UniProtKB/Swiss-Prot annotation:
It is a single-pass membrane protein. InterPro entries: HHV-5_US34A. This is Uncharacterized protein US34A. Belongs to the HHV-5 US34A protein family. One of its GO terms (cellular component) is membrane. The chain crosses the membrane at residues 15-37. It is found in: Host membrane. The gene is US34A. Keywords: Host membrane, Membrane, Transmembrane, Transmembrane helix. Its main location: host cell.
Amino acid sequence: MLKFFLKLRKRRRPVVVPRFVRFIVYVVLFTVAVQRVKQERDAHLRRYEERLQKNRARRRQSFP
């Protein structure tokens, strides 16, 4: 049984991924990463702007 498995492993050659396929995969991963960074930045900016508006409103109330 073990010999059979060893023979199978020897016969299987390493999987060769064509260069253009690898390139496409890298491009997809890169675009996903960029989108995620953009989303994070947008959310951060939105939170920052909301905080600024709250502070302005608070200032307006305290100084009529």
